[in-house]
Amino acid sequence: DSSFKYHLMSAKNNGVTRAEIAEILTHAAFYAGWPKAWAAFRMAKEVWANEDDGADAKARHQNEMAFPIGAPNDAFAKYFIGQSYLASLSTEQVGVYNVTFEPGCRNNWHIHHAKTGGGQILVCVAGRGYYQEEDKPAVELNPGDCINIPAEVKHWHGAAPNCWFSHLAVEVPGEGTSNEWCEPVAEKTYGILR
């Protein structure tokens, strides 16, 4: 059934790993029955067929850049679809962080507020990802690309569906700065990106 395959692909694009889908289908087999589960396992095997072992892909991505991937970004996990990582590079004068996104991971729409100054600068350092402002088309980001985000602009950024992505996030100094986290990026918005 192609509709089930679509749901499996959506799960993969939203960060569900091969190991996690195997656990989910194993659990479901006790309720739906093993014959149906085996059919689901075959479809899942097709969807995750070209996926590298996550540890190998992560190690290859780390080798593409000089900055550390960092630790799982658990403090902000509720504002992300998929797994992100955070490495603090500097907190003096200007905050600089390396943010890494697993394939398909992206943050929610958000706004960097400021009374004066503020905003954020993104510098892509490895992989491939996207940045999008509200009511504008998404912009593909590759190593060396730089995005200047003024304060008060609603936007999101994250990895391409099948590629790791890392960017430096530079906090632009300002007065009265704060972040407002908004809704997740709609699947129809993200789903058209490759």
Question: What positions do the PLM features span?
Answer:
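A short hydrophobic beta-strand segment most commonly corresponding to one strand
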Residues: 162-181
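Histidine-centered divalent metal-coordination motifs
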Residues: 7, 110-114, 155-157
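Conserved metal-binding segment of the jelly-roll/cupin
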Residues: 101-104, 141-162
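Short, charged/polar surface micro-motifs in flexible loops or helix N-caps
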Residues: 92-94, 102-106, 128-129, 175
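A short beta-strand-loop-beta hairpin characteristic of the jelly-roll/cupin
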Residues: 106, 116-143, 153
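Hydrophobic alpha-helical segments
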Residues: 1-60
